[in-house]
């Protein structure tokens, strides 16, 4: 059975394609989600997408994933720099995750340089534009262990 991946996008990522295209590009979130699902399928994996501008809703979705997905790809948006709650949810469900940022947050304002997630992430993808989603999905599909593989250990 193929791996199951949850792709989470945080606040304002619903504006991809129109918000600051000089930073984030012109590809929409719907385009990112469709191409990510197609890429996952080409690798024998399934991918579910979720986007919310609300911290608690993201926490709820992460908790609902416990025991149901093999890996999470998360672009926490601005919550990267503020959300202990999302960090705790990710750690609490014990699902490996990739932290993803479309822009190079380290080349931007100093307050964007700190992440509450990076030290717990299995990997971090920064500054590759929306291509980073393809890289993240492929990494999870190819390199993460499935729930079945973990159970056999």
Curated annotation (Swiss-Prot):
Biological source species: Aspergillus oryzae (strain ATCC 42149 / RIB 40)
GO biological process: 3,4-dihydroxybenzoate biosynthetic process; quinate catabolic process
HAMAP family, sorted: AroQ
PANTHER family reported in the protein's UniProt record: CATABOLIC 3-DEHYDROQUINASE
Family matches, as NCBIfam families: aroQ (TIGR01088), PRK05395.1-1 (NF003804), PRK05395.1-2 (NF003805), PRK05395.1-3 (NF003806), PRK05395.1-4 (NF003807)
Listed name of the protein: Catabolic 3-dehydroquinase
Active-site residues per Swiss-Prot or TrEMBL entry: 24, 101
Catalysis: reaction(s): 3-dehydroquinate = 3-dehydroshikimate + H2O
Keyword entries, A-Z: Lyase, Quinate metabolism
Highest taxon in the source lineage: Eukaryota
Protein function: Is involved in the catabolism of quinate. Allows the utilization of quinate as carbon source via the beta-ketoadipate pathway.
Residues annotated as site: Transition state stabilizer: 19
């Amino acid at each position: 059975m193929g791996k199951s991946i949850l792709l989470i996008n945080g606040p304002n990522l619903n504006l991809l394609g129109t918000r600051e295209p000089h930073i984030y590009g012109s590809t929409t979130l719907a385009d990112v989600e469709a191409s990510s699902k197609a890429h996952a399928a080409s690798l024998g994996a399934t991918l579910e997408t979720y986007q919310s501008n609300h911290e608690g809703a993201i926490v709820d979705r992460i908790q609902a994933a416990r025991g149901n997905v093999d890996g999470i790809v998360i672009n926490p948006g601005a919550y990267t720099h503020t959300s202990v709650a999302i960090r705790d949810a990710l750690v609490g469900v014990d699902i490996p995750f990739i932290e993803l940022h479309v822009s190079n947050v380290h080349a931007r304002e100093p307050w964007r340089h700190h992440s509450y997630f990076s030290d717990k992430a299995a990997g971090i993808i920064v500054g590759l534009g929306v291509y980073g989603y393809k890289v993240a999905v492929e990494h999870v599909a190819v390199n993460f262990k499935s729930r079945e593989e973990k159970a056999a250990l």
